[in-house]
Curated annotation (Swiss-Prot):
Gene Ontology CC: nucleus
Gene3D superfamilies assigned to the protein according to its UniProt record, in alphabetical order: 3.40.50.11380, Glycogen Phosphorylase B, Tetratricopeptide repeat domain
GO molecular function: protein O-acetylglucosaminyltransferase activity
Organism: Petunia hybrida (Petunia)
Pathway: Protein modification; protein glycosylation
Protein name: Probable UDP-N-acetylglucosamine--peptide N-acetylglucosaminyltransferase SPINDLY
Pfam families: Glyco_transf_41 (PF13844), TPR_1 (PF00515), TPR_16 (PF13432), TPR_8 (PF13181)
Tissue-specific expression: Expressed in stems, leaves and flowers. Expressed during all stages of corolla maturation.
Length: 932
């Protein structure tokens, strides 16, 4: 913010000084009647007093040479004419003959030592030569001679002010202040003295005193633009942006082209825009940013903040325009480059995103957010080594950068190192206990190694849910009619209504719901829609349902939307995976709330009533605990709709290869060391057999080598293993099953989409039951298809089943060619019957609600009772004991971060591809609005 400091100039500050530099106090004579003396064209006719009067008139009209000649003519006849000496001195002074002028004034003073006019003009000459002290002494003599002589007082105030400024600039602020006050004592209406006092007090950070002085300066001189400008600076620095803007408006009203004030106005308006935007009025924020550009059209910060605002409004094309403008006008704005990268990354233009992040790092090599974001892109691309390097650099640049540790955890998770992933998530939570992404990623990661031997994973989910629920206010009443048989409004919320694993299991209900009795409302949080999104939307709307796009909308606002839609049963399909809306579910906007499909465990949220499953994935005898009440469907809890891009089933490759190929397309996190041990036993027992594994991280050589090294240590030669990286096109991915004879499921976290895809492409899958839901998903799928014989009860049986399948290539080939039809005729692909079963389940839930049987309300009441009981047991002198940790977990902020656009470290999260069933949440850091 720019201050204006203007050292006053004598000739410009005193109203008693004429335009020609001489004192107005030296008046030309008039006749006895007070009429002006008429000018005669004939000079020689004037003598004595008349000649002096005529000379004064000429001088007033800037005819100094002619006037000087007359004064000298008079002085030749009367050397003691004081008025002529003064007039002569003024004429010489105006012709830049200062020494001769001074001699003339000195002669006048010699004749009349008390002549205030001559003394004052000597002071002016001293000041012109920079001899301020002598000038002041001369003015003081003039005032002593004539205390009422106003020109001397005004000139003295000017020179004292100049002396004060010189002292201030020399570092003697207190002495400078004293001189300013002396100037005010001499002339209490001298505005520049008040103004310069304001400048000094501002520099001394005595802002109340400074404001008072600026206000007095403005009172004495209402057109004092600099005073209004500096008042605005003080108000702006105090955070009183409205008052600052009012001051700048007054400044510009008197001086419309005052560039400093225009720039300051742009800064204040930009800050006000950021303020109102953070308060929730983003449209007004945009208006202020645009107004800032009216005052300073090349102000990069306003352009940058417009980019942030448009990004938050999901108007990404506009955001790109203003980020590029910001960078154009400020080539050092690394934040603009970073936020451009965030947008391009979310648009899947990864090469452009990398280019933007690298540009940001060229400007700021240790810019932790761009280092982190580059690591995010490399992680998505499967470039694990490069990703690790970038994220580690981000942590070195900013050791307290919590989000970077979260992303390091994602990296370890993708590389299959679950223990290191959990450690990284926990490190993130140590730095930022409120990190929603790290908290949920940690829960997801624990599923990969949980065999159900204890309740630690349940307790982790439960504790997370209790803490998370406290961040939201729960609704406890609804206007929904408690008619058990009326049409129900069913809401589904998910970010995965696109070509994603979950989409293959939600399609059947969308297609087969009885919309007359079950009105469907879809809440789509899809980041980037694709053809499948559009197909789903068209299908729902055509059947009379409702489709609402909620990406980027605050979860509390989504809760309000759900209540306005009068949803009776709300089903979330994501759990703790990417872009979930558990914050919305924590508000409990619907009378009945359900979790289904997207996560293989409890959400931990007390506000969710039910978890939909089946008796194969979660047998009635299960010891696995859930916060929600389990509701079991008659067949599988899943219904698979195959991809139309799958293509035909190919012949068994063993027929032409002469050997059997085992394989898995599950993500690497599921392929634990124990899984590899079992697979190695199978491969070693089947001569010449091969293993094909496909997953994204195999694009990185170090990950490939680590994987092969583990298998080699287990006795399997690397030459027998084919590692395939991510295949982008869904058709190509499905056709890759033509390389595989037998699919090997993972444990204790079984495949879901990969198992269905394998069966649909004719590849039988060997799975193994366990004691937790995640372990038993394959059991549910295979039994539902009619392949109970491929379900093992333990590792030895798993190995035996795989060896047995491989031993009879003919039977294997026959099974392959019949599997698709077997699957299509099974309940797993019977969308109509599945949806009827689902609707019956919903109706039962609703009837229970109408009867007052609400699991979540009972659960929450029990929690409150437990807390109250514990509180009553506390000894008064001791600190209160709470069964719930006080560590708060905050909701992620949507939309990008200037503290460091899209917001403070917004959690822009990564969705898994169709071949990976659980998305993890990456923190992609944007930069929020700048304050100047």
């Amino acid at each position: 913010m720019a201050w204006t400091e203007k050292d006053v100039e004598n000739g410009k500050e005193s109203d008693s000084l004429g335009n020609n530099g001489f004192l107005k106090g030296v008046q030309s004579s008039s006749d006895s009647k007070g009429s002006p003396v008429r000018i005669s064209p004939v000079k020689k006719s004037f003598e004595g007093k008349d000649a002096i009067t005529y000379a004064n008139i000429l001088r007033s009209r800037n005819k100094f040479v002619d006037a000087l000649a007359i004064y000298e003519s008079v002085l030749q006849k009367d050397s003691g004419s004081i008025e002529s000496l003064i007039g002569k001195g003024i004429c010489l002074q105006m012709q830049n003959m200062g020494r001769l002028a001074f001699e003339s004034f000195a002669e006048a003073i010699k004749l009349d030592p008390q002549n205030a006019c001559a003394l004052t003009h000597c002071g002016i000459l001293y000041k012109d030569e920079g001899r301020l002290v002598e000038a002041a002494e001369s003015y003081q003599k003039a005032l002593k001679a004539d205390p009422s002589y106003k020109p001397a007082a005004e000139c003295l105030a000017i020179v004292l002010t100049d002396i004060g400024t010189s002292l201030k600039l020399a570092g003697n602020s207190q002495e400078g202040i004293q001189k300013y006050y002396e100037a005010i004592k001499i002339d209490s209406h001298y505005a520049p003295a008040y103004y310069n006092l304001g400048v000094v007090y501002s520099e001394m950070m005595q802002y109340d005193m400074a404001l008072n002085c600026y206000e007095k300066a403005a009172i004495e001189r209402p057109m004092y633009a600099e005073a209004y400008c500096n008042m605005g600076v003080i108000y702006k620095n105090r955070g009183d942006l409205e008052s600052a803007i009012a001051c700048y408006e007054r400044c510009l009203a008197v001086s419309p082209n005052f560039e400093i004030a225009k720039n300051n106005m742009a800064i204040a308006l930009t800050d006000l825009g950021t303020k109102v935007k953070l308060e929730g009025d983003i449209n007004q924020g945009v208006a202020y940013y645009k107004k800032a550009l009216y005052y300073n059209w090349h102000y990069a910060d306003a352009m940058y903040n417009l980019g942030v605002a448009y990004g938050e409004m999901l108007k990404f094309d506009m955001a790109i325009v203003f980020y590029e403008l910001a960078f154009h006008f400020n080539p050092h704005c690394a934040e603009a480059c970073n936020n451009l990268g965030v947008i391009y990354k979310d648009r899947d233009n990864l090469d452009k995103a990398v280019e933007c992040y690298q540009m940001a790092l060229t400007i700021k090599p240790n810019f932790s957010q761009s280092l982190n974001n580059l690591g995010v892109v490399y992680t998505v691309q499967g470039k694990m080594d490069a990703a690790a390097s970038m994220i580690e650099k981000a942590i070195i640049a900013n050791p307290t950068y919590a989000e970077a540790y979260n992303n390091l955890g994602v990296l370890y998770r993708d590389a299959g190192n679950i223990s290191l992933a959990i450690e990284a998530y926990e490190q993130c939570l140590k730095i930022d206990p409120d990190s929603r992404n790290a908290g949920q990623n940690r829960l997801l990661a624990m599923n990969y190694i949980n065999e159900g031997s204890d309740d630690k994973l349940y307790e982790a989910h439960r504790d997370w849910g209790w803490r998370f629920m406290r961040l939201y206010q729960q609704y406890n009443s609804w206007d929904n009619s408690k008619d058990p048989e009326r049409q129900l409004v069913i809401g589904y919320v998910s970010p995965d209504y696109f070509t994603h694993s979950v989409s293959y299991f939600i399609e059947a209900p969308l297609a087969y719901h009885d919309y007359a009795n079950y009105k469907v409302v879809i809440y789509s949080a899809v980041v980037k829609a694709d053809a499948k999104t559009n197909r789903f939307r068209d299908k729902v709307l055509k059947k009379g349902g409702v489709w609402r796009d909620i990406y980027g909308i605050d979860e509390k606002k989504v809760s309000s939307m759900i209540r306005e839609d009068k949803v009776d049963i709300m089903i979330e399909l994501t759990g703790h995976t990417a872009n979930n809306k558990l914050g919305m579910m924590a508000c409990r906007p619907a009378p009945v709330q359900v979790t289904w499909i997207g996560y293989p465990n409890t959400t931990g949220l007390p506000t969710i009533d039910y978890r939909i499953t089946d008796s194969m994935a979660d047998p009635p005898s299960t010891k696995q605990k859930h916060v929600e009440e389990l509701v079991r469907l008659p067949d599988s809890f899943l219904c698979y709709t195959p991809s139309p891009e799958a293509g035909p089933v190919s012949p068994a490759p063993a027929l032409t290869n002469g050997f059997v190929t085992f394989g898995s397309f599950n993500n690497l996190a599921k392929i634990t060391p124990k899984v590899l041990q079992v697979w190695a036993r199978i491969l070693c027992a089947v001569p010449h057999s091969r293993l094909i594994v496909k997953c994204k991280p195999f694009g990185c050589d170090s990950v490939r080598q680590r994987f092969l090294s583990i298998l080699e240590q287990l006795g399997l030669e690397p030459q027998r293993v084919d590692l395939v990286p991510l295949i982008l096109l869904n058709h190509d991915h499905m056709q890759a099953y033509s390389l595989m004879d037998i699919s090997l499921d993972t444990f204790p976290y079984a495949g879901t989409t990969t198992t269905c895809e394998s069966l649909y492409m004719g590849v039988p899958c060997v799975t193994m039951g366990g004691s937790v839901h995640a372990h038993n998903v394959g059991v549910s799928l295979l039994k539902t298809v009619g392949l109970r014989k491929l379900v093992a009860r333990n590792e030895d049986e798993y190995v035996e089943l795989a060896i047995q399948l491989a031993s009879d290539v003919t039977s294997l080939s026959n099974l392959r060619m019949s599997l698709r039809e077997l699957m299509a005729k099974s309940p797993l692909c019977d969308g109509a019957q599945f949806t009827q079963n689902l609707e019956s389940t919903y109706r039962s839930m609703w009837r229970r609600y109408c009867d007052g049987d609400v699991p979540s309300l009972r659960r929450m009441e029990l929690l409150q009772q437990q807390q109250q009981t514990l509180a009553e047991l506390v000894v008064p002198e001791e600190s209160p004991v709470s069964p719930i940790e006080k560590t708060r977990i905050s909701a992620s902020k949507d939309g990008p971060i200037k503290e460091n656009g899209f917001t403070v470290s917004p959690a822009l999260v990564y969705n898994s591809s169709t071949i990976e069933e659980n998305g993890v949440q990456l923190n992609q850091a944007g930069n929020p609005g700048k304050q100047s």
